[in-house]
A protein has these predicted regions:
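N-terminal nucleophile
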Residues: 1-162
Length: 162
């Protein structure tokens, strides 16, 4: 947990040292961080470090942490807690979360940076999906197609004929 305290402390110190210039510009200079990793022989952990320096950890009931526009992609990420998928399906769910957020908020969009950590590997695989990626275009098309198809499978609303 000491590692999670460090970026919070440094962030507060930086904001304090630039308080005057931040006030002039109208910015607050605060930052929120997601910090994750594993010490060899211990379980991996993920922390959400707030601008004030305090933090929360992921848990079995909440295995994901979000920064930024947290309200838009939450449904998709909660699927991970219900389904407990393998890594491949989990990544698709994460991309679904990012795509739904881009649809709901104009200030969010690609590139999407994805970091994958496999337990005990002590290495992150980092990937970037650019806005002009053929893969991104394909999954956007497929998500819309399948979501629209799922609507056809839902029962009619009882009062829809009124």
């Amino acid at each position: 947990f000491a590692a999670a305290l460090y970026p919070g402390r440094v962030s507060r110190e930086v904001v304090a040292s630039h308080r005057e210039s931040l006030a002039v510009s109208g910015a607050d200079g605060t930052a929120t961080f997601i910090l994750g990793g594993q010490i060899q022989g211990e379980a991996p952990e993920i922390f959400l470090v707030y601008p004030e320096g305090n933090y929360i950890r992921s848990s079995k009931t909440r295995p994901f942490l979000q920064i930024g526009e947290t309200k838009f992609g939450k449904f998709w990420l909660e699927l991970v807690t219900l389904v407990r998928p393998d890594l491949g399906v989990g990544m698709k769910i994460a991309l679904g979360s990012m795509l739904s957020t881009t649809r709901a908020n104009l200030s969010v969009g690609p590139p999407f940076d994805l970091a994958i950590y496999r337990n005990e590997s002590l290495v992150f695989d980092e990937h970037r999906i650019e806005a002009d990626s053929a893969y991104l275009a394909d999954i956007q098309h497929r998500f819309v197609k399948h979501l629209m198809g799922a609507l056809d499978e839902l029962p009619d609303v009882p009062w829809s004929d009124d």
